[in-house]
């Protein structure tokens, strides 16, 4: 049943969904190997978001059971968002996709549970709470595809052990599903997996090492099969000797060079490989002791002679390097096979998207699509449920950094004692005089702190925080960035917030904010200051320490991620009255008005800060001078429900006791959208709109009396 109680997890879930949906503005999202899982999460998010908004606006609040459901779903949404934001091109794609797929599956099941709980409470809710009904929402979530590449990989590994596979069709499916669409990506994956396997062997983790060995074999077969396909495509009267073909380009070489491992590659391709920070031989997967490229005159001479004899003209490597090589393994036949078996995801996705876009106005459309696709999805669901369970856990993905790799396997699990032992060793490494040692230690702690609450507690208990704080002044850009991110991850734990602040982190964090080497470091410094400012006493301390001006600078000139983190921090700091004037004097209003352009995807963040600043005289003046009134009116008319609410609150503050602003706002045509808001806005939005309209009426009557 529904009772009146705090709805904190409901709001957290709504905020998390909004943050997740905002990922659609990321430039590199479409190239993410797990993009299709983002789309599935987006479909669920767009379905549940209006339900949550209406639930917040209603008089009913969730029961404890439902609040628990919101909490679980909020955590899955946030974890999924973090995974998409943390994607790095030079990390293992297979494990990344498997992790995303696992979270996407949990998200789907958790959202089903939430809708089922809401359905049980439906009689306690207003009749017009949502459209379509909860039953229809349940059916829509069930339509979200749940085919699993993890099942395909498990089967491929089993077939591999039996010596009967995998088939080319299976290789294609794995490659396409994990974003391994070029020979270079396949080779990178093999190198990353090999490094992870070596780390597993060092820790005597035989189960993990065996699993990784199977995946390495799969990537090797992908490379070999792609090589065979490429050989068949070469228009040569005779077969091209393998020694004349570059393992990276799969083409005839024109400028063969030797690397430190003794292997020969086409110069421009191996140079690109090294320039990416891959200090490992693509063929042998050995570490390269140096980057010198030695011309292989012998191979060049033999190659020239062979080409002349066989009348073959090698392609221009400079043209090849700028073109991407797709993975051409029978793609059409695989898609045709999937379609025959009822797994044509593109059709399901298209139909489902139509339902999501039309369901609010035409709920009857749901049953039509449900009936049409339920049988097909059941087949996929049945097969996915039969996949074998394995006790092995995903290792954390590996991130590559120039000039080498970080040789630390990241686990998601581990006993508290083993983690504590490792953390103590890492803390000693943080104090090392070797930058390489410090770099590896901060990178490892960063991952540990991100992975679990228990890890964050252990890291803080082992007194890692003071050492991390001191590294904020490091002259090594990677160490500094990872140290900041470690503190950000640790600050998720409320007790750690105080430990971080009491370790003197505020001033060093501001130092990074001002002078950080990487945009990532500046953005995460802003995010950490926001996290600390949740505690009331630190709002004043952060403001007095000089954080506001660099936060405003980041708001104006930082990356999009940095702008968002700066806006969030400024919002929290501006709640404290003494900080409002500092934010205004630092020039934040101009940037906030600029960021209300929908192209930035920051309208809601900018508006809520302006609403805070509009409560003081200096803020009102600045908003008026910087052209904030027209954009606030535009948000009232065209913004999201939350955006309209906060824009109206800001306009109400501007107009109160200011006939000049009142006239300006009216001239911008705000009255029609305000009237509409009184009928369809959030509860607070309706209240603010009604108050503003009343104020306009009183203002008009006052003018008439004076006239």
UniProtKB/Swiss-Prot annotation:
Instruction: State the EC number(s).
Output: 2.3.2.27
What UniProt keywords are attached to this protein's entry? Answer: Repeat, Transferase, Ubl conjugation pathway
The record ties this protein, via InterPro entries, to: ARM-like (IPR011989), ARM-type_fold (IPR016024), Armadillo (IPR000225), RING-Ubox_PUB (IPR045210), Ubox_domain (IPR003613), Znf_RING/FYVE/PHD (IPR013083)
Q: What processes does the entry annotate via GO biological process terms?
A: protein ubiquitination
Q: Pathway, per UniProt?
A: Protein modification; protein ubiquitination
Question: Which catalytic reaction applies to this protein?
Answer: S-ubiquitinyl-[E2 ubiquitin-conjugating enzyme]-L-cysteine + [acceptor protein]-L-lysine = [E2 ubiquitin-conjugating enzyme]-L-cysteine + N(6)-ubiquitinyl-[acceptor protein]-L-lysine
- Gene Ontology MF terms in the entry: ubiquitin-protein transferase activity
Q: Where is each U-box domain found?
A: 239-313
Against Pfam families, the record matches this protein to:
Arm, PUB2_N, U-box
The ranges of the ARM repeats are 453-492, 494-534, 536-575, 577-615, 617-656
Gene3D superfamilies for the chain = Leucine-rich Repeat Variant, Zinc/RING finger domain, C3HC4 (zinc finger)
This molecule's function is given as: Functions as an E3 ubiquitin ligase.
Record's protein name: U-box domain-containing protein 2
Q: Which organism encodes this protein?
A: Arabidopsis thaliana (Mouse-ear cress)
